[in-house]
């Protein structure tokens, strides 16, 4: 029997689509329902490696966790990873197929939609319920033609839609009414109800507005979700705007916010740790004194390496190391730490070579075949367990690799430790997520007595809080009817 399909679309980007789908996934999973997440098309630089050796958006990996599933490529069949202001790497069913500009991708959409529908068909045959996340807003007029991410998908598979809006930003009624007004009649009929997200305050004061909204639009308000503080969930793309300041912390970490930063979820455990103060430094900001500089991943490593030089980071890093500070590079950050970075085929932009920062004796050549691995092993610094994933096109070689940072269970080694022990590099994302590895790396950086922190447990607790919020604040009877197809969409 085919699954029931329900889609969540948003009035804006960051309205709460990913979070609401994750919440609904865990709510259904707790009831013993076989549920799967799905996002037809995603644009994000934070990605995850699947059990079948592919790449999907991190939001869908988190939603899979909410369903009690390992991440699979069918959960996000089309992933766009921007590598310039006008172009993106196109990943279909987990594998890169092309790098296209906006015009090129528009022409490719018909092919991409076939991949979307193929994944959809497989999922509806395997699961009882498929919860679908839209992208951006369904009311983007310039993107309506050949849409595969929002109403184009919903109409093709004939599913109901919930529309979510973020009240914390202000203008929630304008967002909802305006979005509905810009939909076609058939699209509007698919919207079965609306959810208001991130509400703070007295719900009684909002009630007159909710009643007006239902009269004005003819759509039921399915609930108002409160602003949930302290959730530990993977960000899909945006770097945290307000990293919590911890003036009494015992370890200071500085991270440059690279223009093409990717998989910045690597710092989530550091952001959550009570003894670690993370400072995210953007253009025009001077790096403050710290114990550790962390160079994150990048989707355009040579471009971001030049950005570091332009903004004086090469001198800042040299000064930091001269005074005894520590330096860690992850994935693209590791490549930057070497002596040279070669891109002969233009994998990440214009073909060419760039000198590295020169803190590790290794060089990297970018190659068309992307390395995608989920890994487990030991951190040789402190002999701690570690797990994570690799997503990179670079192949590194050189003397630095004779002193690896990780011994992997598949027999490979990874990364490097400098001769003086001040500089580390690794291709493995998520290296801080394992409690043992986190403690060992914090000790290396200068925090000898680190409080234990289990990021996976924090994520699980956050998913449970989301499911509790659905149970408490949404009309679960109406949601059950929608999922069971006992109620037609409102008109």
From Swiss-Prot:
Coiled coil: none
Keywords: Cobalamin biosynthesis, Glutamine amidotransferase
Active site annotation, chain numbering: 331 (nucleophile), 429
Record GO biological process: cobalamin biosynthetic process
GO molecular function, one term: ABC-type vitamin B12 transporter activity
Pathway: Cofactor biosynthesis; adenosylcobalamin biosynthesis
Domain of life: Bacteria
Domain GATase cobBQ-type, first and last residues per copy: 250-437
Family: Belongs to the CobB/CobQ family. CobQ subfamily.
NCBIfam families per UniProt: cobQ, PRK00784.1
UniProt cross-references to PANTHER family, sorted A to Z: COBYRIC ACID SYNTHASE (PTHR21343:SF1), DETHIOBIOTIN SYNTHETASE (PTHR21343)
Function: Catalyzes amidations at positions B, D, E, and G on adenosylcobyrinic A,C-diamide. NH(2) groups are provided by glutamine, and one molecule of ATP is hydrogenolyzed for each amidation.
Entry protein name: Cobyric acid synthase
């Amino acid at each position: 029997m085919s699954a029931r399909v329900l889609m969540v679309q948003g009035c804006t980007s960051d309205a709460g689509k990913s979070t609401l789908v994750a919440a609904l996934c865990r709510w259904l999973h707790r009831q013993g329902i076989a549920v799967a997440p799905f996002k037809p098309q995603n644009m994000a630089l934070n990605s995850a490696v699947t059990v079948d050796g592919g790449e999907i958006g991190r939001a869908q990996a988190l939603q899979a966790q909410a369903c009690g599933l390992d991440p699979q490529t069918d959960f996000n069949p089309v992933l766009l990873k921007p590598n310039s202001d006008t172009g993106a790497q196109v990943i279909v069913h987990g594998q890169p197929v092309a790098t296209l500009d906006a015009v090129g991708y528009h022409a490719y959409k018909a092919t991409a939609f076939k991949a979307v529908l193929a994944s959809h068909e497989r999922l509806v045959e395997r699961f009882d319920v498929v919860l679908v996340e839209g992208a951006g807003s369904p009311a983007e007029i310039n993107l309506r033609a050949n849409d595969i991410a929002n109403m184009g998908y919903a109409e093709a598979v004939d599913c109901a839609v919930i529309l979510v809006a973020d009240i914390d930003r202000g203008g929630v009624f304008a967002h909802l009414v305006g979005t509905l007004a810009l939909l076609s009649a058939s699209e509007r009929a698919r919207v079965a109800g609306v959810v208001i997200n991130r509400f703070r305050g007295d719900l009684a004061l909002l009630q007159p507005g909710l009643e007006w909204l239902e009269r004005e639009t003819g759509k039921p308000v399915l609930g108002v979700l409160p602003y949930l503080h302290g959730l530990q969930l993977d960000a899909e793309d945006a770097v945290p705007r307000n990293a919590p300041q911890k003036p009494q912390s015992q370890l200071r970490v500085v991270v440059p916010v690279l223009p093409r930063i990717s998989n910045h979820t690597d710092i989530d455990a550091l952001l959550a740790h009570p003894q670690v103060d993370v400072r995210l430094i953007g253009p025009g900001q001077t790096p403050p004194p710290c114990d550790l500089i962390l160079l994150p991943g990048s989707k355009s490593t040579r471009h971001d390496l030049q950005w570091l030089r332009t903004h004086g980071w090469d001198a800042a890093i040299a000064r930091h190391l001269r005074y005894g500070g520590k330096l860690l590079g992850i994935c693209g950050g590791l490549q930057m730490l070497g002596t040279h970075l070669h891109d002969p085929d233009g994998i990440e932009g214009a073909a060419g070579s760039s000198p590295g920062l020169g803190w590790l004796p290794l060089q990297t050549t970018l190659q068309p075949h992307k390395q995608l691995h989920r890994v487990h092993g030991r951190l040789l610094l402190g002999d701690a367990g570690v797990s994570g994933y690799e997503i990179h096109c670079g192949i590194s070689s050189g003397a630095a690799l004779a002193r690896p940072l990780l011994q992997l269970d598949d027999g490979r080694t990874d990364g490097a430790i400098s001769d003086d022990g001040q500089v580390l590099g690794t291709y493995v994302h998520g290296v801080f997520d394992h409690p043992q590895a986190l403690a060992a790396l914090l000790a290396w950086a200068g925090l000898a007595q680190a409080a234990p922190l289990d990021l996976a447990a924090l994520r699980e607790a956050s998913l449970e809080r989301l499911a509790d919020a659905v149970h408490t604040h949404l009309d679960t009877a109406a949601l059950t009817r929608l999922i069971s197809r006992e109620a037609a969409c409102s008109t």
